[in-house]
Amino acid sequence: MADALIPVEDLSEEQAGQELIRLAAAIAHHDALYHGKDQPEISDADYDALKRRNDAIEARFPTLVRSDSPSQRVGAAPAGIFSQITHARPMLSLDNTFSDEDVADFVASVYRFLGVMPDNSIAFTAEPKIDGLSMSIRYEHRKLKTAATRGDGTTGENVTANILTIKEIPTELPADAPDVVEVRGEVYMAKSDFLALNAQMEAEGRQTYVNPRNTAAGSLRQLDAKVTASRKLKFFAYAWGEMSTMPAETQSGMVEAFKRWGFPVNPLTRRLTSVEEIIAHYREIGLQRADLDYDIDGVVYKVDRLDLQARLGFRSRSPRWATAHKFPAEQAFTTVEAIDIQVGRTGALTPVARLEPITVGGVVVTNATLHNADYIEGIGNGGERIRPEGHDIRIGDTVIVQRAGDVIPQVLDVVLEKRPETSVKYEFPKTCPVCGSHAVREKNEKTGKLDSVTRCTGGFVCSAQAKEHIKHFVSRNAFDIEGLGTKQVDFFFESEDPALMIRTAPDIFTLKQRQEASSLTRLENIDGFGRVSVRKLFDAIDARREIALNRFIFALGIRHVGETTAKLLARSYGSYAAFADAMQEAAPKFGEAWNELNSIDGIGEVVAASMVEFFKEPRNLEVVSRLLKEVTPLDAEAVTASDSPVAGKTVVFTGSLERFTRDEAKARAESLGAKVAGSVSKKTDYLVAGPGAGSKLDKAREVGVTVMTEDEWLALIGW
């Protein structure tokens, strides 16, 4: 791992969005190598770390989840070796929890969303999280029809012939089973069978396999079903897709139905009614983990009643009614050989510990994040001491390294007894190591305290920031220019040739013109390019001369403005001209424009201030002005279409709702394309008022907003 990453808890929304783009590309690459070619180039643990970082970021920023998120697809898109099957119901992923407190928060969120008091106990099921390959098996008229891998969550590979070789999976269901049944579960290889297979491979002088999960996945994708049959794969059923009729009203009842129909179900599954019982069962499974003949990496909790699952519904990527409680991270000891500083797109200076190579959880670790200057000193973001004796981290120290949800491990603590006598305190740089500009810690306007992050003040003068900004600009959820990847951006940015250099985003759109005017430096003659690839690059650039407003705003790289915030802004202002005018009018940070900006649901004072500061900076205005000469941002209405009667409308809920909780009403409105705001303004389209409505109702009447009852709202949305 050449570069350290900012820890999840220190990411801004903007940084998180960019990191999710990087992770999606990396995981898709490794999925394609493994699932498409059966040629993995990283270990199982390293792959898991990528997935865990992605999940950790999405758990902290759930609104940033994109359509190509690994949590939506878990695996590669079908590679073409097998035919494809579209799942009748998508195979989604679960959110992860890592502590008892996280589990308690999950349970509390269920009660809170449903509007149920804790003394009305809700039952949960708890089952081991099998470390295998997810599978959906479809039966029609009780005969096994098809079997598909999870694939990208929407489309999987047809592995029916290979599934038929797994003796534990019935080919025919009993007479009481519905006409259409999709049973979902996990295909896995027992540890004992894995060890026996590797012993056989070693005896034959062949390369052994890495772990049971990867072996099971590769075995299931064999073109010769006889090979699959020889691998002795097994199956646990725990979920379902399409069902013509439901055989039970609870999760536990469904599992019992699977058992009656002849499917193996996990014997450690329990039905529990309190956080204490859930945690106790987690501990019990953890104690048995080493003795089980199959790999598990946690325990999955689900709300038992299916009607409550339906009410809780889904976030954009995962159910609200389930979570996966992962087992603890692994730790190891090593030595800090050096501390380097990396500069990010927003100027953040992130210290990175260069470590003596050590294996943690099956992965060789050479780098670990040190978060920020305070962390090196043993101080947390709130000013508290984060190590037992408040000691600092120094070059030469023996440290405890942990791998958890992050790709890059963290240095947890220092072994003071092994500290060299010659060690000296690390001095955090006061200037940027890239451009030499002052490095400062900004004061938080709300708390009055210094931010934990030290930032370079160089802006676009700093080559590290400028280059990273271009990478952000061309990224998937911004301008998404095919052919301008990391290597290509590095090449163009570092070039000193006027016909090739790209130092700011507008330079991308003048590249073709500069190439046509040059008689000397032809891009097609440079190693790594060529006539066809150059033509495709220019076509890709020209295809982005018109772009959706939300993508344009996101691409500007405004600090704290991530993909979701950009969508909110595009929906609220409609056109770039209106958006830019509003930012200028809001610059004094008071008045109607400022208040309107702050009233947009999901945008607070910190984000609003960052936006108006961006548009006050002359250098930014100059770059945007040049960009607008090359690119046309399309009005939001021109790129947003929906049959929903409330799509694009702004809705405010006030008073008591009788049919739904406030969270349920908000989730339903947003799923139909509406924007739910927290306060009434001239931009509000509907105010849904229940009993006890107060000042918001008065304000709505004052500014002429349409007011409706809960029943009228439900009639409007067709509920």
Curated annotation (Swiss-Prot):
Gene Ontology cellular component terms for the protein in this record: cytosol
**Molecular functions per Gene Ontology:** DNA binding; DNA ligase (NAD+) activity; metal ion binding
Which keywords accompany this UniProt record?
DNA damage, DNA repair, DNA replication, Ligase, Magnesium, Manganese, Metal-binding, NAD, Zinc
> Reaction catalysed by this chain?
NAD(+) + (deoxyribonucleotide)n-3'-hydroxyl + 5'-phospho-(deoxyribonucleotide)m = (deoxyribonucleotide)n+m + AMP + beta-nicotinamide D-nucleotide
Catalytic positions?
A: K129 (n6-amp-lysine intermediate)
Please give the Pfam families that the UniProt record associates with this protein: BRCT, DNA_ligase_aden, DNA_ligase_OB, DNA_ligase_ZBD, HHH_2
InterPro entries reported for this sequence: BRCT_dom, BRCT_dom_sf, DisA/LigA_HHH, DNA_ligase, DNA_ligase_AS, DNA_ligase_CS, DNAligase_adenylation, DNAligase_N
- What is this enzyme's class at the first EC digit? ligase
Q: Which domain of life is it from?
A: Bacteria
What role does it play?
Answer: DNA ligase that catalyzes the formation of phosphodiester linkages between 5'-phosphoryl and 3'-hydroxyl groups in double-stranded DNA using NAD as a coenzyme and as the energy source for the reaction. It is essential for DNA replication and repair of damaged DNA.
Which protein family is named in the record? Belongs to the NAD-dependent DNA ligase family. LigA subfamily.
> Per its record, how is this protein called by name?
DNA ligase
Organism encoding this protein: Allorhizobium ampelinum (strain ATCC BAA-846 / DSM 112012 / S4) (Agrobacterium vitis (strain S4))
